């Protein structure tokens, strides 16, 4: 991935703060990335949101998170929020959504949560 070689890292997470999220709120997710290799690791870390679409399928959107250089044994703590409030460029649908990390282009397993619809709010 553009000069970033695969790295020997252990990734704990992502973990979401709430498994049920009211529409218009934000989800908080955390993770820890640890360099388990013997050499320094150059990392580019993104997060991937799997959005529910109107037809029930999921579409992905990648967001930049950080670039870092970790010494052997060093950790990078991730603590981020992603908003689900109304915006003009995306429409949100209730149901299961997911967040995953992507380190040097390699995705982690995702953490899921349910976006709830409110009766008086357009979704």
Model-derived features with residue positions:
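Beta-strand-rich binding/interaction modules
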Residues: 26-34, 38-53
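Short acidic/polar inter-strand loop motif in beta-rich domains
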Residues: 86-88, 102-111
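Short glycine/proline/serine/threonine-rich loop/turn segments at secondary-structure transition edges
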Residues: 86-96
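A beta-strand/beta-hairpin structural motif
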Residues: 60-87, 115
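Short beta-strand elements
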Residues: 106-123
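Short beta-strand and strand-turn-strand segments in soluble, beta-rich domains
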Residues: 9-13, 53-67
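Surface beta-strand/loop "capping" patches
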Residues: 1-36
């Amino acid at each position: 991935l553009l000069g970033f070689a695969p790295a020997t890292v252990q990734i704990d997470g992502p973990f979401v703060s709430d498994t049920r999220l009211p529409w218009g709120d934000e989800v908080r997710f955390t993770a820890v990335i640890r360099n388990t290799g013997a050499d320094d690791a150059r990392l580019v870390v993104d997060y991937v949101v799997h959005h529910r679409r109107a037809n029930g399928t999921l579409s992905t959107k990648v967001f930049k998170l950080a670039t870092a250089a970790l010494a052997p044994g060093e950790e990078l703590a991730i603590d981020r929020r992603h908003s689900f409030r109304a915006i003009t460029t995306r429409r949100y649908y209730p149901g299961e959504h997911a967040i995953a990390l992507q380190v040097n282009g390699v995705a982690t397993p995702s953490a899921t949560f349910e976006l709830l619809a409110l009766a008086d709010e357009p979704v």
